[in-house]
């Protein structure tokens, strides 16, 4: 494969975003589904973690919730990839949305410490459905936009994700403070219904499903498509490395635990008359909002430079790793909420670059007939990384290690994937 093929994309700008949304009705509907469901998700995630920390008082409960939100995606990823490469991905997304709506409504039954156990199986069920939805969404983008607009669409999706994080964190804190957690759960459930409606209205051709034989239950235990997918990935040198890039984002798992504990104990908002529990929720919201600002600016500012060439995308990923490392290292020595927020912004500025550009590389390198399996593997490996790093963060905090030390160590650990990726870039240059 050409080590630095030109992508030939259009310029990335606000006018280009507007052109894509106005001129491509299918992408506009997929984007609308993303907006409503992700804002609801950020409401929901804050509420779940706040609920667990309030009822149990243990960082480990938050870490366990994080593991259950991500680890099942690793286990079900191969089956999800096969299904997404055999069935219409539009139908997969609709079923996943409707199932998640019912699951989130069920969270309303968690009213006391005695039934807090219900959170965990519900999180597992929701995560299993998400494992089918996300690879399907990533896989359909090349089917609904022109080749030269793929990077533009990915950048817009990332920018939207970041805006949704900012909006969801801000509104989630406000809604929870004013109306309570139940309102947050209801709004998130309805957001999945709205997302399913948007996707239902999409009309596009799915080449992988044309003429495909019917899917049977036995196909889910037939590992030959998975083996074929592994062989395909191994045969593509750059794809073989790119599929592990997101897993190197080691700040994501610990970040969720750190934001929850820091928001509760270190940086809770203490306005006059504000209930302490709701002040803790607002502290979490501010840190999460800072993450959204950084994740928004990262791809937005670097995509116009990097988007034209694969080589630049690869170099930007290396610098993204370093930015994430610097941000969390500095977070470990922050003593005020505003300082912590700036550090989080820097870290996720870099982390978002890694996410967006690795997604573009995977779409660029993979054939449509394998793309579902490629993105399922990508998501599964990434989720395994989140689960492991988040669990370790929770264990260390519960054993008395300060949150600042955990943050600092997380930043230092980010140097490892940066060095591995740097070595890979040098190796490819020598092989070219």
Q: Where are the regions a protein language model picked out?
A:
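Transmembrane alpha-helix termini and helix-breaking/packing motifs in multi-pass membrane transporters
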Residues: 46-56, 107-113, 167-187, 261-270, ...
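Substrate-agnostic recognition of the 12-TM MFS/MFS-like secondary transporter fold
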Residues: 28-46, 66-84, 88-103, 118-177, ...
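Residue-level signature of transmembrane alpha-helical entry/exit and packing/kink sites
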Residues: 26, 42, 115, 119, ...
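C-terminal transmembrane bundle of multi-pass solute transporters/carriers
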Residues: 2, 75-78, 86, 92, ...
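MFS-fold secondary transporters
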Residues: 44, 53, 106-110, 126, ...
């Amino acid at each position: 494969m050409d080590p630095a093929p030109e992508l030939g994309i259009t310029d990335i700008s606000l006018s280009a975003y507007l052109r894509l949304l106005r001129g491509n009705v299918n992408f506009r509907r997929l984007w609308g589904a993303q907006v409503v469901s992700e804002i609801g998700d950020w409401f929901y995630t804050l509420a779940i973690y706040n609920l667990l920390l309030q009822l149990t008082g243990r960082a480990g409960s938050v870490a366990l919730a994080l593991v259950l939100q991500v680890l099942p995606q690793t286990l079900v990823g191969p089956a999800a990839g096969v299904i997404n490469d055999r069935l219409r991905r539009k139908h997969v997304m609709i079923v996943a949305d409707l199932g998640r709506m019912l699951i989130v409504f069920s969270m309303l039954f968690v009213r006391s410490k005695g039934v807090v156990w219900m959170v965990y199986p519900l999180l597992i069920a929701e995560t299993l459905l998400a494992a089918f939805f996300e690879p399907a969404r990533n896989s359909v983008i090349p089917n609904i936009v022109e080749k030269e607009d793929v990077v533009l669409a990915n950048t817009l999706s990332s920018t939207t994700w970041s805006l949704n994080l900012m909006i969801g964190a801000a509104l989630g804190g406000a809604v929870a403070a004013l109306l309570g957690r139940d309102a947050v759960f209801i709004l998130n459930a309805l957001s999945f219904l709205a997302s399913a409606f948007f996707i239902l209205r999409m009309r596009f051709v799915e080449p992988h499903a044309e003429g495909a034989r019917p899917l049977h239950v036995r196909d889910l235990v037939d590992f030959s498509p998975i083996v074929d997918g592994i062989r395909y990935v191994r045969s593509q040198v750059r794809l073989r490395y790119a599929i592990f890039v997101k897993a190197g984002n080691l700040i994501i798992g610990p970040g969720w635990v750190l934001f929850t504990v820091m928001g509760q104990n270190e940086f809770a908002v203490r306005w006059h008359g504000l209930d302490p529990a709701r002040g803790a929720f607002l502290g979490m919201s501010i840190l999460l909002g800072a993450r959204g600002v950084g994740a928004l600016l990262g791809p937005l500012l670097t995509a116009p430079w990097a988007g034209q060439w694969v080589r630049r995308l690869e170099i930007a990923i290396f610098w993204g790793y370093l930015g994430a490392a610097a941000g969390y290292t500095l977070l470990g020595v922050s003593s005020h909420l505003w300082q912590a927020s700036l550090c989080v912004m820097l870290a996720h500025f870099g982390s978002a670059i890694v996410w967006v550009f690795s997604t573009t590389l995977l779409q660029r390198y993979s054939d449509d007939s394998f793309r579902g399996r490629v993105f399922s593997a990508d998501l599964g490996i990434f989720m395994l990384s989140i689960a492991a790093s988040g669990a370790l963060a929770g264990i260390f905090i519960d054993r008395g290690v300060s949150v600042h030390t955990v943050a600092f160590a997380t930043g230092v650990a980010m140097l490892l994937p940066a060095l591995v990726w740097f070595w890979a870039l040098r190796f490819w240059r020598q092989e070219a």
